[in-house]
Amino acid sequence: LYGIKNGTLKKVKLDISKINDSTYISKSISTRDTIGFGVITYDRQNLTNNIFGNHKYSLFKNDTLNFEFTFDSFSFPEKPIQKRFVDYEFFVLNKSRIIKLFGNNENELRFVSKNSNGLIIREGEKATIKIKLSDYDKNNTYLILNLIGDENNYNYDSDNIFPSNKILDPQKKYLFDFNGHKLNIDKNTFLRKSKILFDYENDTLFVFNPYVEAMKNFEVKFLINRDLDGQYLTRKNHDGSSTFVSNKISNGYYSFKTKSLGKFYVDYDTITPEIKRRKRVDYKKQIEYYILDKETGIKIIWVK
């Protein structure tokens, strides 16, 4: 269960009980919030080409369709948009996907046949929510929830806390500057209001929040005072891994666009490329070599 307020989300796990092989039920929910629902589910014989698992997700309020995904087909540009319906914070923490059955009414998407920004539950209102999960062969599973418009009978989970100093409204553009390091964020880069840490400390530029995902590129300009052989910019990711970003300096900056937040710093490539000959000669009598560089990649191959 999600609470939707002022562009932010809070959630709490609901306990459900099995009624029969195809139907589950939850205890009555008392609330006066704007709410939404999310599910963790999968299909053992999934025949759909999507990141969600099931073929169709439907949500009804008092038997009226409120929201529906249908994965008959979708265009290639819609593939990244599917991620908007996944709880990214939960995925980072648990490596499991909650599919959100609410979204943005402004998007006209082929795989969304009915869209809603959530359910507004008013004082004294009573409603029955039915969530229907369907596989490709039209086998269905149902979840029934009863809503009462009253004071909440539950508490949302606490937010995951991390250091932050900027709150971003997705409807605004931002240009931040910290000691010459620049961050340029366009409108609608993030799906909802998001907190990030933008700071520079111990030779590291922080553009960081492990629990949010950018929907489109933002621009970073990393100020550099000197250029040494083997020098390049890298990004430290939330899981501790490092990713090569750039080794090109222009007008005193590493300037690049990315969707990935992280901690950016200068590193040095001290490992020479590896060249390995394939042991056997193929049927065309060709000799093959494998060329690998684990840090910055291969820039030029010269053969004599």
Give the positions of each predicted feature.
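Proteolytic processing hotspots in large secreted/extracellular or virion-associated proteins
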Residues: 154-171, 192-236, 276-278, 283
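Proteolytic-maturation and junctional protease-sensitive modules
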Residues: 185, 211-264, 293-295, 299-304
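Structural beta-strand segments of beta-rich domains
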Residues: 33-37, 216-220, 285-288
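Proline-centered linker/hinge motifs at extracellular inter-domain junctions
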Residues: 1, 174, 270-274
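Solvent-exposed, low-complexity, repeat-rich "mucin-like" stalks and linkers
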Residues: 283-296
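Predominantly extracellular/luminal regions of secreted and cell-surface proteins
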Residues: 171-193
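Beta-strand-rich domain onsets/edges
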Residues: 266-286
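Long, low-complexity serine/threonine/glycine- and acidic-rich segments characteristic of extracellular
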Residues: 7-153, 253, 266, 294-304
